[in-house]
Amino acid sequence: MSFSLNFTLPANTTSSPVTGGKETDCGPSLGLAAGIPSLVATALLVALLFTLIHRRRSSIEAMEESDRPCEISEIDDSPKISENPRRSPTHEKNTMGAQEAHIYVKTAAGSEEPVHDRYRPTIEMERRRGLWWLVPRLSLE
């Protein structure tokens, strides 16, 4: 489905509007009015560009300032740094070995049963936590 308009003028008429005998020239004023939106859009783009450049420069300066090493006096003055020292790798616990250890306790009946570590979740609970996003959320309300 196509639609087209075809305008033809008779030979004795002109394309300028009839003004009742007065001739007015709207050429320059119309051209200026048509150019205002593009000038405003250009000004807004330039302002946005300058804003982005300024933000990027300020964030780069902030990163460079935070990357510089601390002076000893700054460490003493800052409670955040002095109270939270980095832990050395020797103090970290190896959690892989804890899964392999098995502790058995003799019950009163004489049978041996594995002891449940109440500070460590069971393997089934860890599996459930790892797959929480598969379970749909159902409400009973």
Swiss-Prot record:
Extracellular side: 1-29
Claim: Cell membrane is one of the keywords in the record: yes
Coiled coil: none
Compartments where located: Cell membrane
Residue ranges, compositional bias (Basic and acidic residues): 65-94
Record membrane topology: Single-pass type I membrane protein
Chain residue ranges for the region called Disordered: 61-98
Cytoplasmic side: 51-141
An annotated GO BP: regulation of oligodendrocyte differentiation
InterPro entries attached to this UniProt entry: Opalin
Transmembrane segments: 30-50
GO cellular component, one term: plasma membrane
Keyword DNA-binding: no
Chain positions covered by the region annotation Required for plasma membrane localization: 77-93
UniProt keyword terms in alphabetical order: Cell membrane, Glycoprotein, Membrane, Transmembrane, Transmembrane helix
Glycosylation: residue positions: 6, 12, 14
PANTHER family hit by this protein: OPALIN (PTHR21102:SF0)
Function: Central nervous system-specific myelin protein that increase myelin genes expression during oligodendrocyte differentiation. Promotes oligodendrocyte terminal differentiation.
Protein name as annotated: Opalin
